[in-house]
Amino acid sequence: IQRSAAAVEARLNATDDSLSPHAGGEIMSWSDPIEGEVRDDQGICFKNPDTGLFVRYRLAGAYDSNIALLVTVGEDRRKSYEHLREVLRRTVLRGPELQTNLQFHYGLVNWFLANGVDAKPTTQFVVPYLTLLGELLREANEIDADYAFDKLCRRYLAAAKGSAAATKATEEICVLKKTLLGRPLGRLLRQPHLLSAWLSANKNAFEVERGRVTWLRNPFLVLIDTYYLLYMDAAADLPAAHRIWEQDQELLEEGTAFYAAIERRLGETPWPELDAILKSKQPPKGFDSKQWTQVREAHLGFQLGTELYGLLPMIAGKVGFFDLRVNADLTISIPKRLFDRDHQAKMKKVLVPPPVNKSDEIVAVSGGMYYAQEAPGMPHFVQEGQHFEAGDALYIVEVMKMFNKVYAPFSGTVDKILVQSNGTIVSKGQPLFKVTPDEQFTEEDPVEAKVRIRSNTEQYLELVANQHFNAVA
């Protein structure tokens, strides 16, 4: 009988990014278990014996949200966590309207591996942690990564305009690197649980002081690890849309070979020192001027654009991501602001934006079973013609055995109730009430939002780009 010193279990549930139950999704495919993975999936993964294909499975709202239990073991607690991290990294579920807590587990496991797997979290840990991720996403939403890259390339081209050869080379590199840098960065900015995983895994690769990022590890190598962390590396058995593209992989391999050759020639050197040497116009011992010029240009080419990844630790520094930490006694230090109920509710809406209400209606916040009253025989929350205040209860929606009371987002008067029967199945975004609000909605002008986001992006970019250009100069 095999006996292991440690084990860890993750419960895979049908939930959204805020861990609220999310019913109605359908599992169309699920990756096979990998070596060392113990998966109790209630038979969901049994394939059709005749075709060998996965049988679609719909997650009905009338049942518990649990999908599977994932267990890994190891010779110690850290090894079991590392095995679980690899299981979560390589687990792929796909299907229409499907949402699970897979990424939540992946981010959390990376956080514990970075901060201490022997930490002793209490039941008060998860909601503040999710609130912190809401803060991360709120700040990330104010950055346009594509605009930042294009702006950065224009700065490089302006710096190279004195030389036709340098201008041409810079243009080619910018074209080559747009997808190499942009695809993983876009995922990290859009998906807060993955951003948490990245920040945790790379917390020793950088320092953030006074709004400035200093890389302690070669950011080009961090980029390689980022593809691995996101399961977008060349070894991933996935369609092209979900893995690194061939031309990008070739560039990574060339860069890896270049820095390995540099290390052989110059020896192991801390990255800040090595970066300064490679940017210096003075060749070190063992290199002639012509050869060193080629080395220096290659280094600048491989590093071009990687400063964009400095945006991520800057976001973390601004919201205080690393203030959530494990103490010497293994308790967890949680900033007080993350316990504020109103703030928690706001950040939950950032993680999972509620469906947009029209000015004259209120829609269902999620799919599930609709109830107009607290219990049979009790009065309905609202009647037609009744005035309600912001924060008044309007209805209850049951999702996977969880009864959630929904409150009015604004004050107004109910003109018509559109769902008449208790127990009616409603879908997310379905109109439930026709109303007349006390105050008319004013939606943000998309043009103004675009200008605001680009302005914020430029402020971030000035900090990361100026550091790089000043160092090159």
Where are these regions (language model features)?
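Catalytic cores of soluble metabolic enzymes centered on carboxylation/carboxyl-transfer
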Residues: I1-D340, K348, G423-A473
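A generic structural motif
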Residues: T15, Y156, G367, D392, ...
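Residue-level recognition of beta-strand microenvironments
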Residues: V73, Q373, I417-L418, V435
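Acidic, low-complexity mobile loops and tails
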Residues: V326-I396, K405, S411
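A residue-level detector for short acidic-glycine micro-motifs
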Residues: A372, E398-K401, K416-S421
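Short hydrophobic beta/alpha edge segments that flank linear recognition/processing sites
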Residues: Q383-Y407, G423-E443
